[in-house]
């Protein structure tokens, strides 16, 4: 009877209340994707048709996993900027409906570390959700810009948006998720 009640409780427990668990083999340079829970996240997923609305890069795994990402409101003390968050902060249920991690295996370990360091150099810089032609700085572009500095031939799909206040070409997390030679971590 106790087992049945426990199973019923687990089935009825909203998944958003369960904290995400980091993959055991997460390494510096891996990408962490998040399906956010807010309206902006829903809009991003709608506009792009992708599963995820946010992305960050692992810059440290010890003593704790640290993820650098550009965000508007993850941390009220540091709004609209590039920040470093712990994995538990990045994947907290109020912010994350779903989390996934991927390793860009088209880069070797040293290049992934260089990529992470290049993104981390943007810490504290302001968040700019602007079109491609206007020097954007948001979650996807800080990783992509560092990536093309390492591998200039890399090309990701920019999506043209034609909405009031959002007109031009934008790079969504799904574009990085579609790059060849990504290894999705269990």
What function would you assign to each model-found segment?
Residues 60, 120, 124-127, 147-152:
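Sec-exported extracytoplasmic/periplasmic mature domains
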Residues 130-186:
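Activation targets extended, charge/polar-rich intrinsically disordered C-terminal tails
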Residues 7-16:
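Bacterial N-terminal signal peptides
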Residues 1-7:
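Bacterial N-terminal signal peptides that target proteins for export
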Residues 17-23:
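Boundary at the C-terminal end of the N-terminal hydrophobic targeting segment
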Residues 28-30:
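Loop/turn positions that initiate beta-strands
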Residues 111-119, 135, 139-142:
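Stable alpha-helical elements in mature extracytoplasmic
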Residues 34-100, 125-137:
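Glycine-rich catalytic cores of cysteine/serine-nucleophile enzymes that process amide/ester linkages
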